[in-house]
Amino acid sequence: MSCCGGNCGCGSGCKCGNGCGGCKMYPDLGFSGETTTTETFVLGVAPAMKNQYEASGESNNAENDACKCGSDCKCDPCTCK
């Protein structure tokens, strides 16, 4: 298993994303020295939009629904269509 510990994310086209930053990518998990404060602001909420295919009964699943990143930072299994 890589030092990422499975901290990878599948990106577009079933390629592994750049979520794997290597060892100690999360400072609050055993790495200390600096304190970081993060603030999040929610500026608005958009209305729900209906899918154009909804009436015809077609399914529009997200491209990466079936992708998972394995321990070696490669997608496994990749069954995207």
Swiss-Prot record:
Q: Which InterPro entries match?
A: Metalthion_15p
One Pfam family cited in the UniProt record for this chain: Metallothio_2
GO molecular function: any one? copper ion binding
Q: Which GO terms describe its biological process?
A: intracellular copper ion homeostasis
- Family stated for the protein in its record: Belongs to the metallothionein superfamily. Type 15 family.
Checking PANTHER family in the record gives: METALLOTHIONEIN-LIKE PROTEIN 2A
Q: Give the protein name, as stated in the record.
A: Metallothionein-like protein 2A
Q: Which organism is it from?
A: Arabidopsis thaliana (Mouse-ear cress)
